């Protein structure tokens, strides 16, 4: 049986909004497994649906870079937030983002590419930076989006310098229309993505396991009702779920009376051509990475015992 610590209870409470005793019971029932405990609480009707937002537990920077019909995003992690304010680290991340823009965008291609203006690779340059700053760093992930016509809008939230911050977003709008108006619309949608964190563009982008899990939770919450009634409730519940987590169906953050899809359609007139939201990327710093939390009191006690 896993130990149910106060920290574990707090983490579950932060993720679900459920009461402390309910969180403790959920963790006890599920042997300390956070994800299983979330499902347990939801089946009991004690927690809201959780989006797939990983625990933010790593530092560093997310950066975006764009040029014409191309844009890239990259995440470089470090051990402390102090490094994110280091000018050398920021310069490295900026150049690494440019490399992502000029390669296929994969993190493997970025690491192996030559660092701009030097005869070493990006990976080698990072190794030198690690030795200089004295803190471990990693090239975590990168991506590149392209359009044949239109724009790729970018947005950075929590910026510490131009194009670098804690959340980076790319939004690809394919269109033959007015570029300036497309850019304005794209930035608004990028801000929406940063704020509402959609899981996918539409329902087809959500994996079958996630859909099955959501439906199972809905069905279990209405056990005891006739099967046909349960199915209707689950069908209605899944429609609501898709509206909450898919970009095109989400209420637009700048005007909640319209969906993002409706906003795109309405703007086609002023842009002068059809608009297709081809894709988006949202990188949140440290998302999905767990960082070991030190027990300061235990460290002090251990140090005292060694002295």
From Swiss-Prot:
Q: What family does this chain come from, according to its entry?
A: Belongs to the EF-Ts family.
Q: What is its main location?
A: cytoplasm
| NCBIfam families (UniProt xref) | tsf
Lineage, broadest ranks:
Bacteria, Pseudomonadati, Pseudomonadota, Alphaproteobacteria, Hyphomicrobiales
Q: Where in the cell is it found?
A: Cytoplasm
Protein purpose: Associates with the EF-Tu.GDP complex and induces the exchange of GDP to GTP. It remains bound to the aminoacyl-tRNA.EF-Tu.GTP complex up to the GTP hydrolysis stage on the ribosome.
Name-wise, this protein is: Elongation factor Ts
Q: Which SUPFAM superfamilies match?
A: Elongation factor Ts (EF-Ts), dimerisation domain, UBA-like
